[in-house]
Amino acid sequence: MKALLRSLTPPILYKAMHDAKMLLPRATKYRIGEHVIAIPADHNLPIFQEAHRLYDRFLPVLCSQFPATGVIVDVGANVGDTVAAIMQTCANRIVAIEGHLPYFDILRANLEAIDPQHRVTPLNALVGTGAKAGTLVAHRGTATLDASGSGAMQSLDALLAQWRERVLLIKVDTDGFDADVLLSGTATLKASQPLLFWEGGTTGARSFASMYDTIAATGYECFWVFDNFGNLMQSECGTKVLKDFDRYVESLYNHRCTGSISYVDVLASTPKTMPIARAAIEKYRRENIEI
């Protein structure tokens, strides 16, 4: 998935930056606002954010609109780059879940450096319904599920059972398995009606379509769609638009069609959280996009 995004980065820029990174030690440092975190030397985040100014910039804006009470959940927390960004714009507790042990070790070390108040709880777990199993394999800053492995899944509901605070946001980035992650948390979705943010438009169009129907029955009726560079494409649309995007992106993978979008990010809201979502979108337009 990230390979398509990489192909849209100017080749000369990508090669120069990547070659420079390969001269660095196996771990390097990257600044995210006030925090400096450790990342693998081959991690693609610095390249993408250098080339695309809106890449991974929305979530800190969204979290800045949250009340001080309530939990944020990051599934696919990687080495803690998203956590490092959002903890600077809100006061909430954060649950950071990462299934790939080498990334989890870096995540935990980063939290020791940037989270002296222990607001963030790191969990090493593979999240899902159990319909899929495997082992995570890392490549240039992202980890994908290798179905030949035997790693056991834990449901999101089970992992979050110990938290009694309302869940405000569930962010999922698991490279193609986001739908299965969310389907493992339906009790949490019903109880808290959190905002949802996931990476969509993958080869799993059918599993996503099933997930859309499930969350729609829980009250999720309004969606915002961002392209893979972080720019807003659709506001307050319905599930039909999401299904159309999924089929479009699936055609790039399965039918060798030419395209400019390799995936989309989706924000989902119930009527309960619409004021927060709308305020965040307006702030993002004003302070990030239209500058």
State what each model feature region is.
Residues P194-L196:
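Proline-aspartate-enriched helix->loop->beta-strand connector
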Residues G201-T203, N228:
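Active-site beta-loop-alpha junctions enriched in small/polar residues
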